[in-house]
Amino acid sequence: DEGRAQLKELKERFEYPQVDTVFSSPLVRAVETANILFPNAGHQFTVHDLREAGFGVFENRPVKDLVKEEDFKKWITPGSGFVPEGAEPTEQFHARCAETLLKLFEYMIRMDVTEAACVTHGGVIMSMLSQRALPSRHPEQWMADPGCGYTVQTDVQLWMRDRLVEAIDIV
């Protein structure tokens, strides 16, 4: 209930784009967020690969607790190669995120969708944009508060040549 109230407050304070197409993670909180922020969207799709990274043994535990654990620290250290039991390997997660962004834009081009919203999780946003957005930034520099994100755009030349988008605003 607290999260829903925060989203409704954000919606009252800020102007979210009016879009007809919304892509969201299949997780309940993402679908609910999409419904609150984009209630008039005519087409809402849940996309399995927009889900957050699988945390395995660390699933559903507060980050403030996890940062105290050595195995978690190893896992989030770039290049460590450590994968906790049941977790999604970091390289696989990043590959999935990059591929999903490609698929979303390819769908939009094929279906002539000029504006859409994507409601997903912080780690997915950071991964997608660090790999496929200009300006080029490290993942943590793309962090967004809950209910917030980025407006990105591309053009045919930039997309066909480099498979990149350009971040132009914060939502």
Model-derived regions: residue spans:
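Active-site-proximal alpha-helix that buttresses catalytic centers in soluble enzyme cores
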Residues: 1-37, 41
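Glycine-rich phosphate-binding loop signature in dinucleotide/nucleotide-binding domains
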Residues: 15-18, 104-114
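Generic beta-sheet signal
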Residues: 113-122
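Acidic, His/Gly-rich catalytic cores of divalent-metal-dependent hydrolytic chemistry
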Residues: 162-171
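GST superfamily/GST-like fold recognition
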Residues: 122-126, 155
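Short beta-strand scaffold positions
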Residues: 24-25, 95, 119-120
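Domain-level recognition of soluble alpha/beta enzyme cores
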Residues: 135-163
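Phosphate-handling substructures
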Residues: 37-96
